[in-house]
């Protein structure tokens, strides 16, 4: 740490509910990118910020993704390098005796166990879905739709040259209709 690990801890008294969604816990993350660290340092205080995407949409890995999702809804974008990985941070609840992964990410349970020298559990809502709603994800980004891009998908099968021609035909058609292609 710093890096793609968010730790859920008990919030301190006086911390505004707006930063915790009214919960008695708060997620703390210290980014490892230089531009994010410089922004935090320049602010001179902790920064409470959501992900730079519309809820339920895939997380952005490039500034252009943020522009595509939030253009006209935000005042500015601090543009840095593209993300090194397209996976969210691992969310680890450390409020109890046993750390619990609430959202898997690039940092694995095994890596955390090696550092902490203790067993880490994975939240049951991560491992299976319940039809009765009894298992609810405790971390953002764990909904099925979160990882589904908003796009139509067409499967084209067959001989390579025919597949290529059909892709080119569909591309041209969609461009004529004003649809985003690429």
Regions found by a protein language model. Name each.
Residues 1-182:
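Active-site-adjacent structural elements in enzyme catalytic cores
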């Amino acid at each position: 740490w710093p890096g793609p690990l968010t730790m859920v801890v008990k919030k301190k008294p006086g911390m505004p509910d707006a930063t915790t969604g009214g919960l008695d816990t708060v997620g703390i993350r210290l980014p490892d990118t230089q531009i994010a660290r410089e922004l935090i340092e320049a602010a001179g205080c902790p920064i409470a910020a959501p992900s730079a995407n519309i809820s339920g949409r895939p997380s952005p890995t490039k500034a252009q993704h943020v522009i595509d999702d939030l253009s006209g809804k935000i005042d500015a974008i601090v543009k840095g390098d593209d993300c090194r990985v397209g996976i969210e941070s691992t969310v680890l609840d450390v409020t109890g005796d046993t750390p619990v992964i609430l959202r898997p990410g690039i940092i694995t349970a095994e890596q955390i166990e090696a550092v902490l020298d203790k067993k880490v559990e994975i939240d049951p809502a991560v491992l299976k879905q319940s039809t009765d709603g009894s298992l609810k994800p405790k971390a953002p980004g764990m909904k099925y739709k979160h990882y589904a891009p908003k796009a139509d998908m067409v499967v084209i099968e067959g001989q390579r040259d025919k597949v290529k021609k059909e892709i080119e035909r569909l591309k041209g058609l969609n461009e004529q209709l004003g649809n985003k292609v690429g």
